[in-house]
């Protein structure tokens, strides 16, 4: 039997500063890329909000925007001339401007973004029919835009415009439903 000899442990060579710096930079780049992709996907799916109203049609909403906007709300509606082509399947597409001068003034008076926010005054509401025939109302997600811009724009967009536009759209839908129910009752 051979005597046991003592073996020297393998020498561990410390890595140089270049390896640590390269790993750090790679981590920063990978993190930034992941953050950018996540932000892009989040905005893509959340920048437009849509409400579907089964039993109601886009044409009924079009009439409601034209005839039933409550004057005391401070909101004005006007049909938006749009050069967009109709959907290829022939569905109706209506575009409306739904604006409130008080909120528009609040955006224009923003000390940080007042010169550019008037271009973004989020007024356009689009109405079309889903494949099943129900009305789909879409608009910019003003709450999200408020978070992105911050400051006075956040207050105006998130706390003012967003909840009031949602309430007005729901009010129009309720009015259409009531009108349809009354017509049905009056039919012989």
Could you describe each region identified by the protein language model?
Residues 47, 63-126, 151, 159-163:
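Ser/Thr-rich, low-complexity intrinsically disordered terminal regions
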Residues 27, 31, 35-73, 78-86, ...:
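Terminal, regulation- and interaction-focused segments at domain boundaries
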Residues 1-18:
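N-terminal Lys/Arg-rich, disordered targeting/topogenic segments
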Residues 142-188:
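C-terminal partner/receptor-binding element of secreted or periplasmic proteins
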């Amino acid at each position: 039997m051979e005597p046991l000899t003592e073996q020297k442990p393998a020498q561990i060579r410390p890595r140089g500063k270049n390896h640590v710096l390269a790993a750090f930079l790679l981590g920063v780049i990978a993190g930034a890329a992941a953050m950018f992709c996540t932000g892009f996907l989040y905005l893509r799916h959340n920048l437009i909000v849509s409400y579907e109203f089964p039993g109601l049609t886009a044409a009924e909403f079009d009439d409601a925007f034209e005839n039933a906007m409550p004057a005391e709300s401070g909101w004005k509606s006007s049909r938006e001339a749009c050069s967009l082509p109709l959907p290829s399947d022939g569905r109706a597409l209506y575009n409306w401007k739904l604006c409130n001068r008080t909120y528009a003034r609040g955006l224009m008076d923003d000390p940080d973004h007042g010169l550019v926010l008037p271009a973004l005054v989020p007024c356009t509401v689009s109405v079309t029919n889903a494949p099943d025939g129900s009305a789909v109302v879409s608009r910019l997600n003003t709450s999200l835009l408020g978070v992105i811009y911050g400051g006075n724009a956040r207050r105006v967009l998130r706390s003012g415009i967003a909840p009031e536009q949602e309430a007005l759209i729901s009010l129009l839908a309720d009015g259409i439903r009531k009108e349809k129910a009354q017509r049905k009752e009056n039919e012989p």
